[in-house]
């Protein structure tokens, strides 16, 4: 019995870790290291002083059970995408659930995954063992981790999104996603997918625009 209990405890501990009751920005400061491609001016350990609103916004949303969806209008230098990637790292480290990240095109998703997400996850101190164990299960658009999967998709067809059961959905550049003539808008499909999870969350962000173009 003791042997079985030890085996089950060891197996579960590979997937589930006790969440640290610390603020988003403090967790990032302890665990995230930014490469020169991610932060040209300030590579190295994450510094919360460089972004005031984004970490606090995600902190309030993720810890508030009264909210299931969050919509953000962001500028190009707001750091929202970076903090969304950091959020993914924390979820993988502390409360693994299936995650889906959607951009308007597959090529953008591939670029984000290869050049930003993978380096950030690989350098995350809280994911050192998890990333090493899962490294053979990685490619540019799909990641298999103990207890969950992480996928990146282009929003070209609703079918790419509709079939994925997810606990955390992130929609980037939602304003650029194609409109569906027959099916529901892809953002609505994402929101429907997270409703299957008791604690599912969906975050969508886009750039504010005026008639002449994007506001920077």
Regions found by a protein language model. Name each.
Residues 2-216:
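Phosphate/NTP-binding elements of NTP-utilizing enzymes
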